[in-house]
Each structure stands twice: as C-alpha cells, then as structure tokens.
Amino acid sequence: MFKKLFFASFIFTSILNSQEPNLLGSLLYMEVEADVETEPVFAGDDAADDMCVLENLINPEKSLIVSSDKKFGIIVYDLEGNKLYDYEVGRINNVDIIPSKSSQDKYLVAGTNRTYNSIDLYIFNSKGELENNIVREVVPSLKDVYGITF
C-alpha cells in the first residue's frame, strides 16, 4: 500500500512540476484598453461587430482597425476612430488578419460573408486599401457561416 501511495504521489508531483510557468505571456496578442470610439457603421443598430488590428510595426501610430459591418461589408478606421475606407463586399460577420509572408506591406484579411454563405480572403496594404479579393469559398454544407480566425 505504501509503495502505491508513494508512486501515485511521485507521479502527481512530477506532473505538476513538469512544465515551467510561462512568465512572458503570449507573443501573439496584447491586451489594450480603448480610449476612443469609432464612427458609426452605415447600418446602425448592432451591425458593428468583430474587429482586428492591422499592426504597422514600422510606424505603430499608423496601425489601423479593420472591422466588420454585418449589413454592409468591411470598414477601415485609423487609431483615432476615423473612418478611412468602407468596402461593400457583403454581410461580413467576423474578420481576422495576419501579415503576408511574401510582402512586408500586405496583409491577409479573412471574413465570414453571410451574403454568399462564404469565407472570403482579401489582400489589404498597410494603408488599409483593399487590393484584391483573392478567394470567396462558398460553404454549402453550413446553414450560416459564423466566426473565423487564423
């Protein structure tokens, strides 16, 4: 009995101490607190939804906010909340962004599009300009496309 108890205690302690704590946190995200509010979206109501940050690593103050308007498309704001661009691409519900691996000035934005029941991929430049809709993949097996992340 003593051997079994000792062995179980040893295993439990080993598991608890087998990983060092992550004191650095994640390098993939940063918590921020809003100081300003963006201009309202076209549709009003509760149409403003998901957003992501187009992070400008060279000039952080020139980073942008890419947001979805669930009844219109994609809206791009500066960090002061001023609307820079609006793109009528369909009823975009959620958006996410990653920097392009092939170009320092390009970003890949994904969005779920309820108009076409599709997942859309777009190329944006660092100024927030939509350069290309590279993919619109219709997902007929889903009743409603909802949510996306890279």
Could you describe each region identified by the protein language model?
Residues S9-S18:
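Hydrophobic h-region of N-terminal signal peptides that target proteins for export
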Residues Q19-V36:
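Blade/loop signatures of beta-propeller domains
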Residues A34-G44, N82-E88, N133-V139:
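A short beta-strand motif characteristic of beta-propeller blades
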Residues D35-F72, N93:
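Beta-strand-rich domains and repeat architectures in extracellular enzymes and scaffolds
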Residues G44-L57, G90-K101, P140-F150:
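Beta-rich, blade/repeat-based domains predominating
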Residues G73-I75, Y116-I119:
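Structural signal for beta-propeller blades
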Residues L79-N117:
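Blade-loop segments of beta-propeller domains
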Residues N117-F150:
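Asp-box/WD-like beta-propeller blade repeats and closely related beta-sheet repeat scaffolds
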